[in-house]
Regions:
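Bacterial N-terminal signal peptides that target proteins for export
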Residues: 1-11, 21
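Generic alpha-helix initiation/capping and coil-helix boundary signal
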Residues: 5, 12-13, 42-45
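Residue-level detector of transmembrane insertion/anchoring sites
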Residues: 10-14, 67
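Helix-centric, low-specificity signal for extended rod-like, repetitive segments
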Residues: 14-17, 39
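C-terminal segment of classical bacterial N-terminal signal peptides
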Residues: 16-25
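Small-residue-enriched, tightly packed secondary-structure blocks
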Residues: 26-196
Length: 196
């Protein structure tokens, strides 16, 4: 038996199928080559890293003294930390030697326990020995806390620090928009080279 309501519902669908089959599809513009996307992303990371470094120098003048005594500087301009009970943090950064970017790195970490929300901060690591830089270079993912000795600088330490008495391999400054972050640490972070 013929049901006019079903037929009425099918007619528009059939008309759309016929119409779409006779229309020439306009080509979509090609995506730019991934290399130009990668170059733009790399340029942004480099610019953000130097901006973070300059921001640190402006808020903590002693940091510039550490830069003068460092063999390399690893800058993560934007680390995002988020979670609820189980959390994580991560971000990309660059390794700078003699004022030039010589490599890209990723930082990641997981954390457990009571936590809620998200925050963003920057981290700068001053490598004061060639051995520490070599350890970073040869590591297939550096678990921070294993290998080179590390000191995380807080506001009190930064004010009283002197580059004449550097005894650790790596000095870390963790900071946000309001300056150095107290109580921040690097245990559990893993730093891995990106690309070659």
């Amino acid at each position: 038996m013929f049901k006019p309501m079903r037929f009425a519902a099918i007619v528009p669908i059939l008309l759309m199928v016929v119409a779409s089959s006779s229309i020439q599809a306009a080509p979509f513009p090609a995506d730019p080559p991934s290399s130009s996307k990668d170059q733009a992303k790399d340029a942004k990371l480099r610019n953000d890293s130097f901006a973070a470094l300059n921001s640190l120098y402006a808020s903590e003048p002693k940091a510039k003294e550490f830069a003068g005594k460092s063999k390399a500087i690893l800058v993560f301009p934007n680390i995002l930390k988020a979670g609820f009970m189980v959390g994580g943090q991560g971000g990309d950064g660059v390794l700078i030697e003699r004022g030039k970017v010589v490599g890209k790195f990723n930082l990641s970490a997981a954390s457990f326990g009571f936590q809620a929300g998200a925050q963003s901060f920057a981290q700068v690591m001053f490598f004061t020995t060639n051995e520490a830089v070599a350890y970073l270079d040869k590591s297939d993912g550096w678990s921070v806390g294993v290998g080179p000795s590390i000191v995380v600088m807080d506001q009190g330490m930064a004010k009283s620090a002197t580059t004449q008495t550097l005894s650790s391999d790596v000095y870390v400054f963790i900071f946000g928009q309001r300056g150095l972050m107290g109580g921040a640490g690097v245990q559990g972070q893993k730093i891995t080279r990106i690309g070659n």
